[in-house]
Amino acid sequence: MDNDRQKALDTVIKNMEKSFGKGAVMKLGDNIGRRVSTTSTGSVTLDNALGVGGYPKGRIIEIYGPESSGKTTVALHAIAEVQSNGGVAAFIDAEHALDPEYAQALGVDIDNLYLSQPDHGEQGLEIAEAFVRSGAVDIVVVDSVAALTPKAEIEGEMGDTHVGLQARLMSQALRKLSGAISKSNTTAIFINQIREKVGVMFGNPETTPGGRALKFYSSVRLEVRRAEQLKQGQEIVGNRTKIKVVKNKVAPPFRVAEVDIMYGQGISKEGELIDLGVENDIVDKSGAWYSYNGERMGQGKENVKMYLKENPQIKEEIDRKLREKLGISDGDVEETEDAPKSLFDEE
């Protein structure tokens, strides 16, 4: 580029930075090699499936699936992980169904969890936006998109039709939220339900409420489904759950994480350490027996889970070795640069 054109471009960029702040315009190459900043999901299996070691910060995440599949459980584990690293969490309970005792059992510090139970959708999304724009909240969970009922629908009669109201509400909210979420480095998790399209003869009839906006704005979309029941004798104690990464803008998609969700306890950390340990040759399996470093831990997966609960040192050792082998950090992964750099900053 000749000098006159370069001077003209420099002047324009300086004016932009005066008007809109430092970092309003950057060269793409300045960001190459910059590691994605993440926060752990609370599950080493899901961290691995996401490809970057957890949920990317400053992005929108959608978790959807059938009823009682474990969507809220997955989100609560992320909140517990953020809080354990000194972060601040907020929960927008549009369904008015959060169980504080269950949240506490999953490791959530309920005394320091900011909770809102909004009267209507607009209020819930405005509260979420206020939390994000504050820059002081690390994770915001909205449970659920389907329960964000527009004010007009709540104030109307029971039989009134409100075509596309919720979709328009979500579209407008996400247009406002997406930029603020990126700047504040907040992880925003939207939990969603499943509906069926009427009259679909071919293909998948399932869809998610709230229009298409959330599908577009989400960097990660997770589909949560129960695979099978887990039994201890005749008693059903939990579910084997499949979490499929349907969309991923920060790593290759379509990877699947299989976890054990135990009733009243959440994701079994011991269960996933056993499964991943066997896959990665850290835990040895011979028939129904499991052993570590030549020492037998037990016969059958449930017995080995109990062994790991009773021996936290061995559990931590297996966890550390797994994270090292898979290249997953324990906790937050920070970016190399905290703030955007001006094109005119001196090296």
UniProtKB/Swiss-Prot annotation:
InterPro entries: AAA+_ATPase (IPR003593), DNA_recomb/repair_RecA (IPR013765), DNA_recomb/repair_RecA_CS (IPR020584), P-loop_NTPase (IPR027417), RecA-like_C (IPR049261), RecA-like_N (IPR049428), RecA_ATP-bd (IPR020588), RecA_C_sf (IPR023400). Its main location: cytoplasm. It is found in: Cytoplasm. Pfam families: RecA, RecA_C. GO terms for biological process: DNA recombination; DNA repair; SOS response. The keyword Hydrolase does not apply. Keywords: ATP-binding, Cytoplasm, DNA damage, DNA recombination, DNA repair, DNA-binding, Nucleotide-binding, SOS response. Residues 338-347 have a biased composition (Basic and acidic residues). GO terms for cellular component: cytosol. Residues 325-347 are annotated as: Disordered. ATP binds at G65, P66, E67, S68, S69, G70, K71, T72. One of its GO terms (molecular function) is ATP binding. It comes from the Bacteria. The keyword Lipid biosynthesis does not apply. SUPFAM superfamilies: P-loop containing nucleoside triphosphate hydrolases, RecA protein, C-terminal domain. Belongs to the RecA family. Can catalyze the hydrolysis of ATP in the presence of single-stranded DNA, the ATP-dependent uptake of single-stranded DNA by duplex DNA, and the ATP-dependent hybridization of homologous single-stranded DNAs. It interacts with LexA causing its activation and leading to its autocatalytic cleavage. This is Protein RecA. The lineage of its organism: Bacteria, Bacillati, Bacillota, Bacilli, Bacillales.
